[in-house]
């Protein structure tokens, strides 16, 4: 009987400690999530030249050069990538 009570107390202690750990992790992660949602994301066919990871899901940043243009003149926009 004493062993059963000890196991119940141990289980309660572990569960409470786990809740505290999860709460602390949520507090650490939430500023990054708030920053991302405050900044928003880049929509379809909008330029992503200066933020290549900022496209809204399911879009991704695709960049290319137009023929005859210098390599420094890159065009980027959010679009669906099909294939690779």
UniProtKB/Swiss-Prot annotation:
Disulfide bridge map: 41-56, 48-61, 55-78, 63-76
InterPro entries: Spider_toxin_CSTX_knottin
Gene Ontology terms: cellular component: extracellular region
Prodomain residues: 18-38
Keyword Nucleotide-binding attributed: no
One Pfam match: Toxin_35
Domain of life: Eukaryota
Predominant cellular place of this UniProt entry's protein: secreted
The keyword Transmembrane is annotated on this UniProt entry: no
Signal peptide as annotated in the record: 1-17
Subcellular location field: Secreted
Keywords of the record: Calcium channel impairing toxin, Disulfide bond, Ion channel impairing toxin, Knottin, Neurotoxin, Secreted, Signal, Toxin, Voltage-gated calcium channel impairing toxin
Tissue specificity of this protein: Expressed by the venom gland.
MF-aspect GO terms: calcium channel regulator activity; toxin activity
This protein's domain notes: The presence of a 'disulfide through disulfide knot' structurally defines this protein as a knottin.
Function: Antagonist of L-type calcium channels (Cav1/CACNA1). Causes paralysis in the posterior limbs and gradual decreases in movement and aggression during 24 hours at dose levels of 5 ug per mouse.
Family statement: Belongs to the neurotoxin 02 (plectoxin) family.
Protein's recorded name: U7-ctenitoxin-Pn1a
